[in-house]
Regions:
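Boundary segments of small protein-protein interaction reader/adaptor domains
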Residues: 1-191
Length: 191
């Protein structure tokens, strides 16, 4: 299994070296677009709509759109500094809670964690503690320059880290259209 990230699980004075592996894989069939005549894959070019010309990689910068069509450019050095400040290779456990305390709507992606060199004993201790207490670790971690919330839990003899959404990323259920009121079901229809 391919290692996609190496770092540490940390809480208190404990640091456990780990490797992270994707727990799922996409099995969707991907169709390519081809030129009908010669069956060659279509190429996509990056074009500036204002200058009306193709843009090379070295001419492209990343930016945050803070309001419609208003941007602040974010340099690579800025992102590296943020990563350095926030511990880009650490999964920092900030609390331990019961799994039932986090609604499944918050869960996003799952990754397996395996012990890295020198971490076997501490990994085993954390795994056993989570299994026996039925608790999960709520953590902060950096993935691709973005701080994420996550949980670490016991799963089939291994540790799994699952990224979770921040509360403001989950849409309000009140915004779902055409949901009937709760009292619209007759009790005997349920029997």
């Amino acid at each position: 299994m391919h290692t996609m990230w190496k770092g540490t699980i940390s809480f208190g004075l404990v640091n456990i070296p780990v490797k992270m592996h994707a727990a799922t894989e996409n099995k969707d069939v991907k169709l390519r677009q081809l030129h009908k005549e010669c069956k060659t894959p279509i190429k996509y070019e990056k074009v500036c709509p204002v200058c009306d010309r193709k843009v090379e990689e070295d001419e492209i910068v990343r930016a945050y759109e803070y309001t419609k069509n208003k941007f602040v450019v974010v340099e690579d050095d800025d992102l590296k500094e943020i990563q350095k400040e926030q511990g880009d290779k650490a999964v920092e456990i900030i609390d331990f809670v019961k799994l039932e305390e986090i609604d499944p709507i918050y869960f996003d992606k799952s990754y397996y964690l395996s012990p890295n060199e020198g971490g076997l004993k501490a990994y085993s201790l954390l795994r056993t503690a989570l299994e026996e207490t039925g608790k999960i670790g709520v953590a902060k971690m950096m993935i691709r320059s973005k701080e994420r919330l996550a949980v670490i839990r016991f799963y089939e003899n291994t540790l799994v880290v699952e990224t979770i959404h921040y509360p403001d990323e989950v849409r309000a259920v009140q915004d779902v259209p055409n949901v009937p009121e709760k009292g619209e079901v007759v009790k005997k229809e349920l029997d």
